[in-house]
Amino acid sequence: MQAACTDAPFVSVHMRGRYWNWNPVNLRKEIDFAAAVGAQKLVIHPICLGLVDPDDRLEVGEVRRVADYAATRGVRLAVENVKDSIWILDRVLDEIGVDPEETNLGICVDVGHAHLSRDAGRNPVCEYLERYANAMVHLHLHDNAGVRDEHLALGEGTIDWRRVVGTLTACGYAGTSALEIHGGEGAPLAAIENSVGVLQALA
């Protein structure tokens, strides 16, 4: 795995599904794995911090200790939005801190998930991007038709990518992003190339 990542411009790791629960020991193991493959960022779902329902509460002290541990390993944590998760991201930033440079914990805006959300007005993707612009450290890019989390190639769904690129430019985002495309109808490389082409045409 480490050899496969050697020539990549950057490496990000998504927390593995079997660890999708709040367990600081397992989270540290994932941080160690990320560090071992040279990943600069570890993307975690809210459930990995114990946040599923509005009544759930962060173990603030332990989350901060985990984030500090990640910093010693050269890994930044990024909490990814799921559908309708403004309340979650706001809570994390309110209780842990809004500056990733200080907390070593930022936001990964998943554009596809934002497109499915109903908690952010008529243009949810742009709302998520603008709302978390100062805390964004990573992006997940994929498309869908606004109904299911399809992880389509860019341009195959209903996301307005021109508007996405314009919003990111206006926000001054200069961080990393990753294509999160499933399948590509049997031609995954073509799906990736087409998605890159969509972005290049809008740059």
Regions found by a protein language model. Name each.
Residues 1-5:
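Aromatic-lined substrate-binding rim segments of carbohydrate-active enzymes
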